[in-house]
Amino acid sequence: MAVVDVVRRGREGCCRDLLADGPQTAVELARATGLHEPSLYRLLRSLTGFGVFTEESPHRFALTPLSSTLKTNDPSAGRELVLTQQWVSRAVAELPRVMASGETGMQLAFRMPVFEYLTQHPQQSADFNRTMTAFAAAELHAVAEAYDFSGAHRIVDVGGGTGALLATVLGRYPLVSGVLFDRPDVIDEAHATLTEHGVTERCEAVGGDFFESTLPSGDVYLMSHILHDWDDDRCAAILRNCRKTIDPKGRLLIIEMILPAGDEPHPAKMFDMYMLVLSGGMDRTAEEYRELLHGGGFRLTRIVPTQSPVSVIEAVPDLDGA
């Protein structure tokens, strides 16, 4: 989803024209346009990160010099847009209906959730996994350098994809073992990564469903770019499943971008729109993660920044709430 595409589709909701008379809240704009207010708020918030709107106070938006000059009939708007995956393009094209209904672009375009679509389309799934691996490559060493894993014994990477992050951590900590857990079709592609990093003797690869399956036991659970794929209820289900098997003295490490408060530019604001369109998930603020973890039986202990857009959110089992 290119910025120009979000800007163009945001203007289709007439927000620019409505804000021409002065700042308004997301609730007021939703009422005037008939759009789904939570989805509209997230769209407007994402655009503040690129100077299109400004959030003058919580949930209250105003025009910037950039949005004041946008022309709704400009034929060149969005002409540089390049979407490399056709199925993603189709989902993004549903953004106006997403804004009106609150459904995902995948549901509107394909009548199925994104991960069901990927399961049914192996080639698209393989391309998607390679794209995610390439995207996360810059984060791998940043996470491994920022967080001290030396006290870990057995790391379980929940939804770990092809294993690049876990393999990187195990490569730095030769006394630590690991378990890579993901869908069986994803695990099939992970063996090459584990072999390449020389960690196959210390790392199991287990297929399953992190909603339903009994997770492998461990003292450190790792989840990288998992929770942002899901809404709060589904995240709580994942966290509760982790809580069942994690060591009572263990740690849960969540690798995600954290949304800043206000209109500070941050890439998480744009990726939040991807989540809205593709999966119905969301990127979250630190306080939202704190509340989410509490609902899943964990207590947030600290947030460790890295030399990349992501942070390591550390949590421990909430023994008082057990």
Q: What is each of the regions a protein language model found here?
A:
Residues M1-Q24, E28-H153:
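Conserved Class I S-adenosyl-L-methionine-dependent methyltransferase catalytic core
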